[in-house]
Each structure stands twice: as C-alpha cells, then as structure tokens.
Amino acid sequence: MPRIIKHLGRVDYEPTWRAMQAFTDSRGAETRDELWVVEHPPVFTQGLAGKPEHLLQQNDVPVVKTDRGGQITYHGPGQLVVYLLVDFKRMHVGVRELVRRIEQAIIDMLAEQGIAANGDVDAPGVYVDGAKIASLGLRIKNGATYHGLSLNVDMDLTPFSWINPCGYANLKVTQMKNLGVNLTVAEAADKLLPHLERHLSTSKETA
C-alpha cells in the first residue's frame, strides 16, 4: 500500500505527539502508513531514558517528557522532522534494521548534496566528521512505529549547547547550511522523502 505523505508545516510538538499516539492506537491491519513532515517551534523533548541532568542550562525553551526512546534533544525552526507512522511488521525486518534503513536514507540524501555522512552502531543518528546532523527516536507499539527523525537544515544551533544532546556530553552538532548546502526545510524534505520511501520498501533486496 502506498504511504500517505502529510506536510503539516510548523506545528506545536505536544499535540502532534498526541495525534501520533491516537493514529497508532486506532490503526488496523489495512491502515496505510503515513509520513508526517513538520517543523516545530523551539522545544526540548526528553525520551524515556532521559535524565534531568542532561539539561545543562535553564532557559525559556519548554521541556516535554515524551514516550520515544532515547534522551534529550532539541527541535526548532529550520530543522526537518519526519514522523514515521509505519507498520514495520509488513517489512519483515527487526527494529535495528529499521533504524539502519532510516539512517541510510538520510546518508544517501546528504551524499547527493555532497555531504559525506555516516551512522554509528553505538549511537543512533547520522554524523558528519563526528558532529551529529540527524537524530532518530522511535516508539514501537503493536508492531507499528511512531516518532521518527530530525535533520538539521538551517537553524539556530545554540540551544544544543544547553543540553547533552541525546545524553552525550560535549557532542558536537552541525547542519546542512554550515556544510555549504543552502536548502529550505521544504526543499530538504523533497530530497529526503524519495530515499525514505525506497529504504522503507517491504522488499529486503531493494533497501
């Protein structure tokens, strides 16, 4: 079944998260997968493993405790967020392979823009010369995923210095703009989505 792509624009984090939960709770065997393309106003989200000490500096950015995996991260304008509402039982792959495919989609998209990036088996996400450019966080429920990925496109990276991103002290972050690629979030989405569609194919051979 073809996936439904929804471009939702700039939306608040918490109601979007609640909508993902509701979608996942109500989906059935024939429900089509959806990819939600969004930006968020400034917000820190703290995953199930999140520890308060990873918020290093008090500030005006709200902190939302959420139900994805992982630690604390930052979302803000100029960052592409894609939520993956996927029945991964249909793909006949495990969670680790699903994460690898999402990472590879981002790596392939960045390569097209002349950016050499890589994953890290010990720390999910995508990195350029050791600096994180994309983060992943998923929740699995009844064989389906929600939450997803964030890719730094053209944003103010300062709030990342107020946290230990993803729980790692002194982790550097980067973005496409700093690497010489000037795209809007919408343009970055248009370039990433075909790679996501390909890597989320149900066929193991085509990923």
UniProtKB/Swiss-Prot annotation:
Substrate binds at R68, G69, G70, Q71, I72, T73, Y74, H75, S135, L136, G137, G148, L149, S150. Residues 29-204 form the BPL/LPL catalytic domain. GO terms for cellular component: cytoplasm. GO terms for molecular function: lipoyl(octanoyl) transferase activity. Pathway: Protein modification; protein lipoylation via endogenous pathway; protein N(6)-(lipoyl)lysine from octanoyl-[acyl-carrier-protein]: step 1/2. Its main location: cytoplasm. The record marks K132 as: Lowers pKa of active site Cys. It comes from the Bacteria. It is found in: Cytoplasm. It is an enzyme of class 2 (transferase). Its EC number is 2.3.1.181. InterPro entries: aa-tRNA-synth_II/BPL/LPL (IPR045864), BPL_LPL_catalytic (IPR004143), Octanoyltransferase (IPR000544), Octanoyltransferase_CS (IPR020605). The active site is at C166 (acyl-thioester intermediate). PANTHER family: LIPOYLTRANSFERASE 2, MITOCHONDRIAL-RELATED, OCTANOYLTRANSFERASE. NCBIfam families: lipB (TIGR00214), PRK14342.1 (NF010922), PRK14343.1 (NF010923), PRK14345.1 (NF010925). Belongs to the LipB family. This is Octanoyltransferase. It comes from Chromobacterium violaceum (strain ATCC 12472 / DSM 30191 / JCM 1249 / CCUG 213 / NBRC 12614 / NCIMB 9131 / NCTC 9757 / MK).
